[in-house]
């Protein structure tokens, strides 16, 4: 089983590279690979446990939604937050009811089943949208990238609420009062727990120091799970809570945030592989011919009527340009969210005449395969690409090329800085003294501040990062090493190597030619 799982993940990684080369969304490749391994595929893996799939996929979707919030840079998103949140909520409702009306009036489905299909496919998929924007680096005009990211991350809770409420009505257990109570509970507990967990997590992160490396990532992972599980346990909207907590934590000033974003990038990437592969595994291609025509009709109506109408009604009053409306309409990708909600409907006790799961599955395949593939070309044809924009700025792992780095230097009695004022020292251009540590005192210096022997001077400069050119390695010196006892200037190294640091008995030494190497030293060497 472990061997098979490893092979599947490796195949997904390989297909990711292949799909990127041919311009196809990677998530489509994961689904198709799942179908290849499934009951009707080449490898005939028997899997039809919808309940198990729903539980796994719901948690996975919670992680994706949390990451959608955590990775969104609010300073960029807040410029378009008002209209985008209206688009996420009202847009999902309008899309659901328009699609439901089409299913009833044109395809002849039952009213409640029609509305259920509309609700299930009413939200855009954060994983699909993020994947296309990042992989294709779509730098879009008028803040459109931020609109798409914020909408796709925040409209899932609305689709979930609609789906839950309609399923309740289909089972005949919903009254007008029960409908209102369910709606209020979803919103109240979702927002309430999201706010409380966010405040508690921020308080702990800022006051608790994690000594062991990686424990901050473990802590945030636990918070993400808690933000979904707690409100869900009391009838609240776990996805709404997840997104709120993700937004708050992702935009709180905490150390190592970029590393956390990259950690969750990896976790979410693995979750997407698991989720989309599992959805493909669950599908039966042999059952699709009977539903391909209604699925195609719904997909066409959704893409060319329902979604554009909802976007136009909401965005035009905010002064959106027609080409921006066209692009936002086309970028309404359906993905894992819709299929997970379809699984939720399938395992529910509500009676349905149609194969909702496979109908939604086909719609998602068409959406990712056609819309996702053509989105970069569509953006270019609409002249929505702006080379002066950078889509990566809308994500929290973006950092400017001129990121500031800090270094500290201890001033020895024989240093030519000792006893001199800062303004009299010829520092290189671009280097700034930002703080002086003197005994237990922290001094914010001016040009007239005098540096004394024993001071620790903190300097800032523009950072440099390029992992393709430099490799750091450690070298331990034992008593038999040929360098032991020699000065740095006396050792012979290759021309592209340099000793950048020496660890000695818990101290960090920045070497010069006069420094003599000793037994037990750990040399940090860089090579080009």
State where each predicted segment sits.
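Transmembrane helical cores of multi-pass secondary ion antiporters/exchangers
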Residues: 1-388, 401
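Cytosolic regulatory regions of ion transport systems
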Residues: 309, 316-323, 327, 337, ...
């Amino acid at each position: 089983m472990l061997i098979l799982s490893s092979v599947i993940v490796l195949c997904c990684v390989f297909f990711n590279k292949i799909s990127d080369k041919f311009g196809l969304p990677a998530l489509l490749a994961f689904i198709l690979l799942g179908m290849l391994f499934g009951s009707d595929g080449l490898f005939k893996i028997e899997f039809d446990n919808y309940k198990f799939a729903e539980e796994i996929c719901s948690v996975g979707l919670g992680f994706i939604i949390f990451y959608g919030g955590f990775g969104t840079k609010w300073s960029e998103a807040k410029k378009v937050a008002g209209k985008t949140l209206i688009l996420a909520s009202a847009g999902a409702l309008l899309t659901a009811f328009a699609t439901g009306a089409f299913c009833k009036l044109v395809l002849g489905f039952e009213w409640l089943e029609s509305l259920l299909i509309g609700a299930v496919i009413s939200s855009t998929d954060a994983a699909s949208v993020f994947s296309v924007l990042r992989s294709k680096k779509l730098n879009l005009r008028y803040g459109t990238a931020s609109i798409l990211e914020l909408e796709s991350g925040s409209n899932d809770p609305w689709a979930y609420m609609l789906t839950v409420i309609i399923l309740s009505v289909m089972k005949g257990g919903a009254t007008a009062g029960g409908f209102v109570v369910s709606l209020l509970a979803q919103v109240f507990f979702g927002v309430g727990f999201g706010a409380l967990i966010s405040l508690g997590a921020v308080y702990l992160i800022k006051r608790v120091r994690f000594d062991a490396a990686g424990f901050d990532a473990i802590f945030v992972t636990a918070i993400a799970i808690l933000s979904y599980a707690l409100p869900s346990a009391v009838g609240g909207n776990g996805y709404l809570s997840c997104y709120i907590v993700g937004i708050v934590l992702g935009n709180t000033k905490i150390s190592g945030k970029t590393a956390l974003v990259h950690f969750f990038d990896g976790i979410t990437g693995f979750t997407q592989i698991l989720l989309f592969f599992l959805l493909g595994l669950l599908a039966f291609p042999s059952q699709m011919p009977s539903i391909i025509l209604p699925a195609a009709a719904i997909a066409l109506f959704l893409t060319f009527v329902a979604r554009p109408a909802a976007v136009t009604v909401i965005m035009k009053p905010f002064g959106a340009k027609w080409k921006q409306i066209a692009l936002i309409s086309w970028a309404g990708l359906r993905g894992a969210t819709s299929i997970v909600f379809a699984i939720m409907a399938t395992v529910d006790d509500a009676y349905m005449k149609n194969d909702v799961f496979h109908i939604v599955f086909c719609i998602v395949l068409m959406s990712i395969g056609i819309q996702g593939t053509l989105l970069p070309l569509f953006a270019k044809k609409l002249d929505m690409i702006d080379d002066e924009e950078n889509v990566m700025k809308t994500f929290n792992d973006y950092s400017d090329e001129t990121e500031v780095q800090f270094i500290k230097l201890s001033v020895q009695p024989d240093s030519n800085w000792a006893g001199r004022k800062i303004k009299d020292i010829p520092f290189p251009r671009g280097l700034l003294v930002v703080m002086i540590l003197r005994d237990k005192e922290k001094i914010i210096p001016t040009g007239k501040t005098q540096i004394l022997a024993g001071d620790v001077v903190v300097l800032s400069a523009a950072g440099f990062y390029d992992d393709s050119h430099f490799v750091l390695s450690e070298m331990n010196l034992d008593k038999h090493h040929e360098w032991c006892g020699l000065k740095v200037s006396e050792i012979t190294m290759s021309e592209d190597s340099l000793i950048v640091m020496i660890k000695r008995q818990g101290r960090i030494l920045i070497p010069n030619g006069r420094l003599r190497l000793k037994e037990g030293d750990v040399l940090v060497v860089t090579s080009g």
